[in-house]
Design a protein with these regions (language model features):
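Well-ordered alpha-helical scaffold segments within catalytic/enzyme domains
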Residues: 1-13, 55-71, 115-130
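Active-site cradle of extracellular carbohydrate-active enzymes
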Residues: 1-52
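Non-transmembrane alpha-helical segments in soluble domains
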Residues: 4, 17-20, 59-62, 87-91
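Solvent-exposed, flexible loop/coil residues
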Residues: 42, 54-57, 76-79
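Active-site rim elements
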Residues: 42-48, 69-76
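Aromatic-rich carbohydrate-recognition surfaces in CAZymes
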Residues: 51-55, 62, 83, 87
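CBM-like carbohydrate-recognition segments
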Residues: 72-159
Length: 159
């Protein structure tokens, strides 16, 4: 995500292409399951927080790197994995995390979710008012260091 943002800022097309290719051919196919979940994250001690972080980072990649010719928001792997599917999977558990089907995070469970960037980016990309509405309701200025550390974009509206 950081490489993509710096590459775009500096106009480094080679690195932007590298990041886009890595998203399509490494990150999305290897980190997302067919249902849109992130199995590597759901096996960790903080599966909820890390799943959110992973989706935030991927959504930010889509936001930073998408062009008319290469729209990562619309990209889908041959086996159906996409950022849209990832958002659709996690969204219900942002709305009501008591329905989270995996173990609770061992720490900071009560601090999540906050105003996650994937919600506002996804709302814009997919014209989904529900994503924006829930984003507006969530905490926009978290105070817990662990939450701040795992919130890759704190002001998504400027992106």
């Amino acid at each position: 995500m950081q490489v993509a943002a710096f590459a775009k800022f500096t106009g480094n097309e080679k690195m932007m292409d590298f990041c886009s290719d890595r998203y399509k051919n490494v990150l999305l196919p290897n980190q997302m399951a067919a249902d849109g979940s992130f199995p590597r994250e759901t096996r960790r001690t903080k599966p909820y927080g890390y799943s959110i972080f992973n989706l935030d980072a991927m959504a930010t990649l889509c936001q930073v790197l998408s062009t008319k010719e290469n729209n990562l928001w619309e990209y889908e792997t041959t086996d159906g994995k996409s950022i849209k599917k990832g958002i659709a999977f996690l969204y219900p558990f942002i709305v009501d995390k008591t329905k989270w089907p995996f173990q609770k995070d061992v720490m900071y469970w009560d601090e999540w979710p906050v105003a996650q960037p994937f919600l506002v980016f996804g709302a814009m990309a997919f014209n989904n008012k529900e994503y924006l509405d829930i984003w507006k309701q969530l905490e926009h200025d978290p105070k817990v260091d662990e939450v701040i550390r795992n919130l890759p974009v704190r002001n998504p509206l400027i992106w």
